[in-house]
Amino acid sequence: MKENPFYKHFIAHIIILALGFAMIYPILWLITASFKEGNVIFSDPSLFPEVWTLDNYIKGWEGIGIVHFSTFFLNSLFICILCMIINSLFASLTAYAFARLKFPGRKIWFAIMLITLMLPGHVTMIPRYIIFNMFGWINTFYPFIVPKFFGGDAFFIFLMVQFIRSLPKDMDESARIDGCSKFGIYLKIILPLSMPAVITTMLFTFLWTWDDFFSQMIYLNSPSMYTVPMGLRLFLDSTGISSWGPMFAMSVVSLLPCFILFFSLQKYFVQGIATTGIKG
């Protein structure tokens, strides 16, 4: 008996929809819970509230104490935008050197860089803290921004090296014959053609910096310097009195830049991941 493909595809789509709903349900619950009154968030089992209210957003945006949540939001945007631009620029420069230029010890340095991918971030956390403390950078944004100038993110360098190696070298030779310098080749040929990988780097840098809590907790100790993850922590009280409603509301607000950035750059993001062969 011949198997009916309709039922096969129907069952497959049902399973995919069920898995998709299971993955997106926590976000849906977070969004709807942010519109519930504080005393029914955990007692009301329904997904949609009976009474919709914006009080959580108003109270959450007012922040904790004298510091408004807008301060945390702007601090995060400032750090993320600078890190995104600087990291993509200097990571692409470093990747161009590894992929196109010939210099002594290139393979050795590239191998050493790849080895650093195996090191947990916590291994270098204490040495970095000691160095930044010697520089007087504690409670400043410098520990997050300055290291990006040195192309120290091995993951993004490796991603861009893979992309640049896939580009034909004939264009480099033609530009060199026309008198273009090595930096000119990078600026006029390699960088424009590598925009999918550059945008992928920018997107990942923004998301990882925006979500970073551990590093920001170590280096920032003044509420006026707090970022969004640190600001959300202020809604939780160790005594048991926590402002869940405002925290959920500000969590929804904190997701907006990530959603906007991802969906606006989704085409380049998918192209960069597919071309470099990197899987999430």
Protein language model annotation of sequence segments:
Residues 2-280:
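A structural signal for multi-pass alpha-helical bundles of membrane permease subunits
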